[in-house]
Amino acid sequence: MTVLFTDFAMRRPRGPPPERNTNMRNSPLHTPPLGPQLKRWRTLHRVKQSHAAELFGVAQSTISRWEAGIQQMSADERAMAERLLAARLDSAGDHALARLIAGSTARMHLVCDLTHRLLACSPSRAAEFTRPLSTLVGTSLWRYASPEIVRMEAALDPLGWHDRAGPPSVEFATGANASRVVPIRGSTCRWTRMMLSDGSAARLVETL
């Protein structure tokens, strides 16, 4: 199943794209509550709430409130949770997925669903970059997001994107960005969220 976004708000405006600063600070990454993801991580790794509380240096009741969405994490607690939940290629299956993407003829790449760090990339996508792929792998691509991508990211929560292991893919129209390093041109983009072996979430980004 795929969710399509073709309303006016998601379409590229007429005329040339406006100049924009691609600095990430001007387009803050929409950050959903991490409690539900922490709970899935605990379940997968059989970590009790009491042990998670020790890891974070908080009371067990705090872990419970995070997971229930009653209490939000502080900035330091969230940074620790992001390090814990960030996608990484650990298992043979994860690396096989990366090889499939690296060998694909389609324009696609794989990023961490939480941080947008680049995990894998197809040759046709890498050919669009003006920096060597090796210098971009492991870094966040969010700073290169187009305005449409920024809006779509903020629209994921109402879709239950972060609440389920395998939500429907989303397709939307994006305009261009102002980057020469990671250029984005007017096109249709598809995002698919998938779980890696350690329970972290990755996102397959395809240009259709």
Residue ranges and their predicted role:
Residues 72-94:
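DNA major-groove recognition helix of helix-turn-helix/homeodomain DNA-binding modules
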Residues 46-64:
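Short alpha-helical DNA-recognition segment
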Residues 90-107:
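Short, basic/aromatic recognition patches
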Residues 18-43:
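A short, Lys/Arg-rich alpha-helix, primarily the initiator
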Residues 106-108, 112-208:
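Sensory/regulatory domains in signal-transduction proteins
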